[in-house]
Amino acid sequence: GRGYSERPRTKYDKNLYLETLRELILSQKINEKVHIVGYSMGGPIASYYAAEYPNEVTSVSLIAPAGFSKSLPQTKSWITMPVVGDWFWRVFSHRLYGVGNMSETQYSDDPLSINEDKFLPLFQDQLRFKGFNESLLSTIRNFNLFDVRDMYENLSKKEIPMLALWGKKDGIVPFSGSEEYQRIFDNGKLVVLEEGTHDITYRQPTIVGTEIIDFIDQL
């Protein structure tokens, strides 16, 4: 449903993403444990996988992970409504993306940073493919992006080494969620990017990449 992957007409729920990730890993014929990394919505997906297959996972690294919120945004209640939600999404989704896809970070001195003029065309290219809006709407309706703390609690019992990287100025997945992360994963590592926003993967990639590599190397 994202990037250049297929956009089947189906329910985009936890099971779909979990099964897709499972198929991908099996297709690579990996015969050892994996270090799994999830960004934003990928945080819960990676964590669901680790909770389901703990004996196959060495570590989990979360980048600005969704699912630690204590409250549900008002917008979601509108979008989940039949007919009204469909109409709203058809009419306004492109406009929302026109604003929402702008980087929160106006400047980055990271030499590997992807600038706005390069990022936006790549991001917006997805919108021209049939099924993108539908898959995104289905995800919002069927995948819990906001509060999956029960799943995280279950994962914490597996005693898998955990890392979370979070921008303190994240306007998409609030930094306040890091408090719940630390409560649930009391032995987990938290790296805070003081000036980081939600786009730390492509605006501060050097810091993010280095922290993940160092974390894995120490295991």
Where are these regions (language model features)?
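Active-site loop/oxyanion-hole signature of alpha/beta-hydrolase fold enzymes
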Residues: 1-37, 210
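Gly/Ala-rich beta-loop-alpha elbow adjacent to hydrolase catalytic centers
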Residues: 38-42, 46
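Flexible "cap/lid" loop of the alpha/beta hydrolase fold
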Residues: 48-51, 58-91
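Conserved alpha/beta-hydrolase catalytic His-Asp/Glu region
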Residues: 71-73, 77, 91-157
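Acidic catalytic loop of the alpha/beta-hydrolase fold
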Residues: 144, 169-173
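Short alpha-helix in the alpha/beta-hydrolase fold that links the catalytic acid
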Residues: 150-152, 174-183
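Short beta-strand/loop motif that positions the catalytic acidic residue
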Residues: 158, 164-166, 170
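Catalytic active-site module of serine/aspartate enzymes centered on a nucleophile-bearing elbow/loop
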Residues: 187-219
